[in-house]
UniProtKB/Swiss-Prot annotation:
Protein name: Fluoride-specific ion channel FluC 1
Chain coiled-coil ranges: none
GO cellular component: plasma membrane
Location in the cell: Cell membrane
Family: Belongs to the fluoride channel Fluc/FEX (TC 1.A.43) family.
Reaction catalysed by this enzyme: fluoride(in) = fluoride(out)
Lineage summary: Bacteria, Bacillati, Bacillota, Bacilli, Bacillales
One Pfam family of this chain: CRCB
Amino acid sequence: MLVNFLLVGFGAALGAMLRYGISVLVKSKWKTNFPSATFFINITGSFLLGFLVSSALGPVWQLFLGTGFMGGYTTFSTFKVESMELKWKTNYRVLFSYLGFTYVFGLIAAFLGMMLGV
């Protein structure tokens, strides 16, 4: 049981560090009102988690990569906070684009990942 917690925790730490690195890189390259870093992270995360869920990985790898790494990598809470910030700035065009693109492309990415993982 302790091993499972360690697998999830170590995976989450690695995923969070990768998310942070990508976020810093994207924000330094592209200055935009659209939250590009979080969008990229969540779409690639949807694809990768879809792939992992449908692949034949054993339970240890599912815990480490699926629950841990992907849980640390993707960021639902940042997505919601950035959405509220766009609302408060009354930047509704970007807000609704962000919401729509994230949900639509997230579903498409998860579907494609699941199809490739089979």
